[in-house]
Each structure stands twice: as C-alpha cells, then as structure tokens.
Regions:
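Gram-negative outer-membrane beta-barrel transporters
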Residues: 225-369, 373-384
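Signature of Gram-negative outer-membrane beta-barrel scaffolds
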Residues: 1-129, 165, 321-327
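C-terminal beta-signal and terminal closure region of outer-membrane beta-barrel proteins
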Residues: 519-573
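Short loop/turn motifs that connect adjacent beta-strands in outer-membrane beta-barrel proteins
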Residues: 69, 126-132, 220-221, 302, ...
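Extracytoplasmic gating/loop element in the C-terminal half of outer-membrane beta-barrel translocons
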Residues: 373-499, 535-557
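Solvent-exposed loop/turn elements at secondary-structure boundaries
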Residues: 87-117, 122-281, 481
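Residues on the lipid-exposed face of transmembrane beta-strands in outer-membrane beta-barrel proteins
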Residues: 58-64, 76, 120-124, 213-217, ...
Length: 573
C-alpha cells in the first residue's frame, strides 16, 4: 500500500510523473508497505493459506400443549465446528511468547467441542379468543462461525508471509500492479518483518443469551404488538496487540495537557522480527435491548395500514467490523486501554427507527381477475453511529486511527499548541466553518489563534460536543442526522386459469426514495446504519495539533441519496 502524506504530496507526484521529472530525493509517500510470500518456506511466491473448515448442526424440538390455550416449546441445538488443518508452528515465536507469558502459540488448533444451545418458549392465549396473546422465550444462540477471523491465524503465522514497511521512503515509484511490487521492495534495506495472528489458548466461539417477551392484543379495532428483546453476550471477541504495552505514563503527563489521562504505550518487540502480534480473545461484556410497538389496521374495502416504532441500545467492546485482525484492533477507537477496551455503544447502534405503510388493494372485472395495488412506505431512522477521533498516534501504540477525541473546553483550547504553516484555500467558500469564523474567501496560512477560533466554533456548533465538553467522545456516542425515506409501490395483476390451476401475471413499479425525486434536498442518506469514523484534526506529535476547519462530518452520501426506479414482472403458476 502507498500512503501519501496529504493531497498536496499526491498532486506533486502526479504532476512530476506526467512531466517525467520524478525526484528520487523527495518524500512523496508517508508510508509504503508490501507483503510477500517467503518462498524459502512456501516454495510458491503466490502461496495461499491451507485453511479448511466445516460445521455440523443438530436440532431437536418438542411442543407441549399444557392446556388448549397454553403451549410450551423446548428444544436443544448443537453445533460442532470442524477444522481440518492446523496453523503452522513458528517455533522461535512460540518460544518468545512463552518467555513473555503471553499464553499463545501459532500452531494452536481450535477444538471441535460441541456448542450447546438450549431454548424454551411459551404462548398463552389468555382469553382463549386470540384477542390477547402473551408469548416469550429464552435461549442460547450460536449462529454461523465467522471463519474469516479464524483464517487470519493460518495466513499470518510469521513464517509464510513477510511485510516490508518504511516511513517517508525516497526513490520509490508508484507501481499499481500488485504482482510487480518486488522492484520497490528490493530497494528497501530493512529485512521483512513478521505480523503474527494468534488465539488465546482457551478461545471460544461467540454465543449470546437471548430473551424475548411479546404481547399481541386488539384494542379499539386495531391489532397491536408490544415486544421486548434482550441479548446478553456470553462469548464475544476482542483483540489485543501483544507487541505494545503501557509505559505507566499518561498523555497528560507527557504533554502537559493534564485533562487527558489516556495511557501511553511503547513497543515491546523492538529488536525482534515481530512487528505486530494480534491475539484474538473472548469477552462476556456487551448486550442489546430492543423495545418495539406496532399497530395494524385492516379495512374490508382493501386498505391496510401499519405503523411501528423500535428503540435500540446496543453495547459492545469490539464490534468486529473488519475481516482482518489488525484492522479490528487498530480501528476500535478507545480513550482507555487499547488492549482492554471499554464497554461502549456498538457500531450497529441505531437508537430510533420508525416504519409506516399504507396499501390499497382493489379487485375488479367480471370474475375479479384484475387486481390493482398502490402502496406508500415510510422509513425513518437515526443516522449511522459515528466516532470522532484524532488522526495521528497520540498514545504511542502504533495506530493512527484509534484515539478518541477529548472534547475540550474553550479554556483548554487556549492552552493547546497548534501547528504552523497550515495552508487553507477557501476562496470559493466551500468550507462553511472557515467562512463563518474567518470570513468569505479566505486563502492563506492559518495562525495558531485562528485554529483555536475554528476549533471553538466547531465544538460549539455541534449539539453533542457542546453538551459534553470536558469529556472524551465515547465510541459511537452520537448518530448522524435522522433520515426520512418514502417509497411508492404500484402493481397490476391479472389472474387466469390454466388447466384448472390459478395463474397470475403481475407488473410492478417501485419508486425508491420518492422524496429525492420530488426535491434534490430531500431523502438524504447519512450512512448505512453502520459505524462511521471521522478525523477532523491531526496530532502532529510533541503535544501539537493541526485543525484546518475543512472537515464536514455530517455530510450526506450523494450516491445512496438518489432516487431509483425498479420495474418488475412476475408470473405465478
């Protein structure tokens, strides 16, 4: 991978490349990394991990009619994970890990111990007329095993693959062919380093305990459903980077910013070939609670109405948002211990969701063979959860994207040091914050005081940060703007008999995101319900920050905010 320092460095490389004047002494790139198979071990430069696995599942269930109106269901599910290969033993690493009491080894094979999931449920027709039904259940759920996380440990034992990494490289060309990187790697003087992925010895697969209680009832001629679902983590995953450890100091002690007490780290594998050691561990922390209420009304003239509201709170230690071990660790933003992250809102926490629909059906014709359906669907929900982090390695753990922001007070901003020579071009007023604070058409170098003014205004303009000054921006503590989306469904169906069997032909047309069709400023999508990361300012090192005011965290997605039309044809026989 090639990491340019910033857009200015990319623009310079592009201009020099077009002109044929690449400067071998210029630092175009911030970092260059290249992974290659160790052919002395693999015998094949395009080696792939010999990973194979399977899963057996068995389920037994019985229903007991305690009374005609009360049913009790109980069952037992069993999953057996199967692993047909074992990761390669890296004996030098295993000895190093044992000497440091890490409790890990590269050739640890996960067991095929059965995973038991007992479940019970009930259904009670209270008045025996189906007007008031109480139902619920309790059980353990395993689900499908995320084999992609497991496969990392087969690929990265530290033997088959080597990684070359250099900061601020000089004399490297931008080679786009992934199979042609050897030319650049050959120019690097350092030996290839080893990233190692391992399990803790007693690693268990993820399981949750889930309970639900629902009440279906009819009131005022409307069918209602109230339901609560609670899921408690029994075993979930999180990652540790064993190649770093806390120094015993805090960021505040090192920089003089005494309000920020996040721990500082140092590398523990200096002088070894092990650049990163990511270990997969279990945690029992985490839960999800859903509360919902739904109302439905069906009219005998063909109109069906529905509306529902769901409130959600989802907490986790690590949301497991990546398929790669290193990313799951380094992008799990934290303000505390990166190897023991705090329980916080998850990347999937969408607290409010509203749904409503109105469908009208009408049949006509001599034999009622024609049916027309018109539907209007509304979906409203909280935007994607997000975090605000500082780009740069504030705590020395080697990761540039996992340090949650401290939300400073104005007095603390006055004490912060800011970088010099920060250029900003807002001559066309494309950055609202800069226009608001520095006036229209600003184009020049920001002073420290101007950066302080921009940061004060930015914090003050954000509703969440304004109310949480003097705190860390907790992981996924806020959500992007609430979204409103309307869809339209139109369908025309014709029914007929063929050989005594009823057949039908249906033509349908759906308008998805109707609001955006009517007005380009309506129907905006601010995310996909999945956690987002924003890094509006940088940490330059030695207690110095850079804030240029150009970041717009709450911008909408221009692609998914567009309206779409969908034409369908269905034949049923």
């Amino acid at each position: 991978s090639y990491d340019f320092t910033d857009k200015a460095h990319f623009d310079k490389y592009y201009a020099d490349f077009i002109a044929g004047t690449i400067d071998p002494t210029y630092n175009y790139f911030r970092q260059y990394r290249f992974g290659v198979a160790n052919v002395d071990v693999t015998g094949d430069p395009r080696w792939k991990a010999p990973f194979s696995a399977g899963q057996l599942g068995f389920y037994a269930q019985d229903k007991w009619n305690v009374t005609p109106s009360f049913q009790f269901t109980y069952g037992l599910r069993m999953e057996i994970p199967l692993f047909f290969k074992t990761p390669t033993a890296n004996e030098p690493f295993n000895q190093y890990a044992a000497a440091h009491n890490w409790g890990v080894r590269t050739n640890h094979k996960l067991s095929s111990t059965p995973l038991w999931s007992p479940r019970v449920g009930f259904r009670w027709d209270i008045n025996k007329d189906r007007k008031y039904i109480l139902r619920g259940g309790l059980g353990v759920f395993t689900g499908r095993i995320p084999y992609v996380w497991i496969s990392n440990n087969f690929v990265k034992t530290g033997l088959q693959m080597q990684t070359y990494s250099v900061n601020s490289p000089k004399g490297l060309d931008l080679i786009l062919d992934p199979n042609g990187q050897e030319a650049n790697a050959a120019r690097l003087r350092a030996a290839g380093s080893q990233e190692v992925n391992v399990f803790e010895d007693n690693f268990k697969f993820a399981q949750t305990l889930k309970a639900n209680l629902g009440f279906d009832f009819n009131l005022l001629g409307i069918d209602w459903t109230a339901e609560a679902i609670y899921s408690k983590t029994l075993n979930d995953i999180y990652y540790k980077n064993l190649s770093v450890d806390k120094t015993g100091q805090t960021f505040g002690q090192v920089t003089g910013y005494d309000w920020d007490n996040r721990p500082m780290y140092e590398r523990t594998t200096t002088g070894t070939p092990y650049s990163y050691v990511y270990a997969l561990y279990n945690t029992s922390k985490g839960y999800t609670l859903n509360l919902s209420l739904k109302a439905e009304k069906h009219f005998n003239f063909g109109l069906d109405l529905m509306a529902s509201y769901t409130w959600t709170r989802s907490m986790s230690v690590n949301s497991g948002t990546s398929s790669v071990a290193g990313s799951n660790w380094m992008f799990n933003a934290t303000y505390r211990d990166a190897n023991d992250p705090e329980l916080s809102l998850s990347a999937y926490n969408v607290p409010h969701r509203i749904q409503a629909s109105a469908y009208y059906h009408t049949n006509y014709g001599a034999r009622k063979q024609w049916e027309t359906t018109v539907g209007l669907i509304y979906q409203g929900r909280s935007g994607s959860p997000y975090v605000i982090e500082v780009y740069g390695d504030m705590n020395g753990d080697g990761a540039n994207g996992n340090d949650l922001m401290w939300i400073p007070t104005d007095a603390q901003i006055d004490k912060m040091k800011f970088a010099s020579n920060v250029r900003v071009n807002n001559s066309k007023d494309i950055y609202p914050l800069i226009t608001k604070v520095l006036g229209p058409g600003f184009n020049g170098t920001l002073t420290e005081d101007q950066q302080r003014s921009l940061m004060k205004q930015w914090v003050g303009d954000d509703s969440y940060m304004r109310d949480h000054r003097g705190e860390y921006f907790k992981r996924y503590a806020d959500n992007l703007a609430f979204e409103h989306h309307f869809d339209v469904h139109l369908a025309q169906k014709y029914s007929f008999k063929v050989g005594g069997q009823l057949n039908s032909l249906e033509l349908s047309f759906d308008i998805i995101n109707l609001g955006n069709l009517l007005n380009k400023d309506w129907g905006h999508t601010y995310g996909d319900g999945f956690g987002r990361y924003f890094s509006p300012f940088n940490y330059e090192g030695n207690g110095v920050f850079k804030f240029d005011g150009t970041h717009v965290a709450r911008n909408y997605d221009t692609y998914y905010s567009r309206w779409r039309g969908q034409l369908g044809l269905r034949y049923t026989f």
